[in-house]
Amino acid sequence: MIPGEYQIQDGEIELNAGRRTLTLNVANSGDRPIQVGSHYHFFETNDALVFDRALARGMRLNIPAGTAVRFEPGQSREVELVELAGLRRVYGFAGRVMGEL
């Protein structure tokens, strides 16, 4: 193996198999671009993003790890969210949960 080399298996890989998902319409009401990473608790994103926050509690973007979605000022788009896994405890981010979901 060469350092940094990828050895990719043939076929498809299904991300987040079996987890509940949700599609939301999200609008950037601000005057600056907002980028949200793959594992950010979507409920706690920038307040300039307008969407049903209650539905997004305990969820993150359903995109590959290490990637992000960018919302330009005035832009509205649909995003798919997936429920958080593991112990379902959320600490940090914007400090709106700080414990179990």
Curated annotation (Swiss-Prot):
A GO molecular-function descriptor: urease activity
Pathway(s) the chain acts in: Nitrogen metabolism; urea degradation; CO(2) and NH(3) from urea (urease route): step 1/1
Keywords, sorted A to Z: Cytoplasm, Hydrolase
Pfam families noted in UniProt: Urease_beta
GO BP of this protein: urea catabolic process
SUPFAM superfamilies recorded: Urease, beta-subunit
Chemical reaction(s) catalysed: urea + 2 H2O + H(+) = hydrogencarbonate + 2 NH4(+)
The keyword Hydrolase is assigned to this record: yes
EC number per UniProt: 3.5.1.5
A Gene Ontology term for the protein's cellular component: urease complex
EC class: hydrolase
Subcellular localization, as worded in the UniProt entry: Cytoplasm
Family from the record: Belongs to the urease beta subunit family.
NCBIfam families reported in the protein's UniProt record: PRK13203.1 (NF009682), urease_beta (TIGR00192)
Oligomer and partners: Heterotrimer of UreA (gamma), UreB (beta) and UreC (alpha) subunits. Three heterotrimers associate to form the active enzyme.
Protein name according to UniProt: Urease subunit beta
